Amino acid sequence: MLRLSVKTKLSPLQTLDRASKYFEENGLALVETISHLHGKGGFAEIRVSGGKLVGKAEYDSKLVLDELTNDARSKFGFEPVSFGLHFHAPLGHVDVTVSNEKPVEVSLDSVEYDAQVKQFANKLPKA
């Protein structure tokens, strides 16, 4: 098991996109996308299953999470503080948490994918 944290010059969205592409190319499946938001007196967490979602039509999970996060911001005044990706594979998993601040902090937790996590962290442009 490995826990690693790095700061990057990338935006939260760029970091999430890179993480999604990198870990999926390394054989992990995106299981869940997460948005963690804070209000003045509490918090909200939005979780959306990874991949495609079917409702009135077929939607990408990233689009659904983005829309729900924007609704929580505009309707309720909650502000996103972090975003997350949860990946699974037959041997283990990887969790990626990305802060919504400058510089962006990326926290990586791994079970059985330590080498890939280190390689991904090393590829990020450092803040």
Spans of model-derived segments:
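Hydrophobic, Leu/Ile/Phe/Ala-enriched alpha-helical segments that form helix-helix packing faces
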Residues: 19, 23-27, 68, 72, ...
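Solvent-exposed beta-strand/loop surfaces of large extracellular or lumenal domains
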Residues: 35-36, 41-50, 64-70, 75-78, ...
